[in-house]
Curated annotation (Swiss-Prot):
GO terms for biological process: plant-type cell wall loosening. Residues 1-21 form the signal peptide. Residues 41-155 form the Expansin-like EG45 domain. GO terms for cellular component: extracellular region; membrane. This is Expansin-A33. Keywords: Cell wall, Cell wall biogenesis/degradation, Membrane, Secreted, Signal. It is found in: Secreted, Cell wall; Membrane. Gene3D superfamilies: Expansin, cellulose-binding-like domain, RlpA-like domain. Pfam families: DPBB_1, Expansin_C. Residues 165-244 form the Expansin-like CBD domain.
């Protein structure tokens, strides 16, 4: 089978990279155990984070940062604030990908266990990521963070789930800003159709597209866009992941 043809559309002459010039204060805790197993899955829909290309450098975001799933896939560099805590490991920082939601806990005060309650900016990091910047026994530390471009290996991936008249497509391993803002789908016998966000980075179509090859347009929150032609062949199957040869 011929490799899919990929068209890259640059909407701006100088593509904007999602980089924050200034550091922003927040706090950070950890979850998921020393092997990070408890961080697999999550509210972004990426499933096994190793298979999805994200690994253990991941974090759940408080709702103030998560934005109902719109920030899934964003990358942040996080540094422990040594000016406020002796539990920090000086001179260290780590870049993580947002893969989950840290839900509010309104039974606790925001400064006494309800770390993810709005309007707090908080990262609940995988334990391996967290202990690279702070001492395990601390439990919670003050940090500074900034959003940075995502560096991913290989192409954008699409997992097609669902059933007839309901395609649920997970878009992942996305570079650049990392944050998918819009997805469109095209069957070989249809025009382009906008997909709607179902949850996290799962995008929904209600068209009947069986026996048609499928193409996708992926637009990031910085307005950059790629078109991936015929990534899924006409005999595609639900439950299958298709990997493109392009990324941002």
């Amino acid at each position: 089978m011929a490799m899919p043809v990929v068209q890259v559309l640059l909407l701006c002459a100088l593509a904007y990279q999602a980089v924050d010039a200034q550091w922003t204060p927040a706090t950070a805790t950890f979850y998921g155990g020393s092997d990070g197993a408890g961080t697999m899955g999550g509210a972004c829909g990426y499933g096994n984070l190793y298979n999805a290309g994200y690994g253990l450098n991941n974090a759940a975001l408080s709702s103030a940062l998560f934005n109902d799933g719109a920030m899934c896939g964003a990358c942040y560099t996080i540094a422990c604030d040594t000016s406020q805590s002796t539990w920090c490991k000086p001179g260290t920082s780590i870049t993580i990908t947002a893969t989950n939601l840290c839900p509010p806990n309104y039974a606790k005060k925001s400064d006494a266990g309800g770390w993810c309650n709005p309007p707090r900016k908080h990262f609940d990091m995988s334990q391996p990521a967290w202990t690279s910047i702070a001492i395990y026994q601390a439990g919670i530390v003050p940090v500074n963070f900034k959003r940075v471009p995502c560096q991913k290996s290989g192409g954008i991936r699409f997992t097609i789930s669902g059933r007839d008249y309901f395609e649920l497509v997970t878009v992942f391993n996305v570079g650049g800003s990392g944050v998918v803002a819009q997805v469109s789908i095209k069957g070989s016998k249809t025009d382009w159709m906008a997909m709607s966000r179902n949850w996290g980075q799962n995008w929904q179509s209600n068209a009947y597209l069986n026996t048609q090859s499928l193409s996708f347009k992926v637009k990031l929150d910085d307005a950059r866009e790629v078109t991936v032609w015929n990534i899924a062949p006409s005999n595609w199957n639900f439950g299958t992941t298709y990997t493109s040869n392009i990324n941002f």
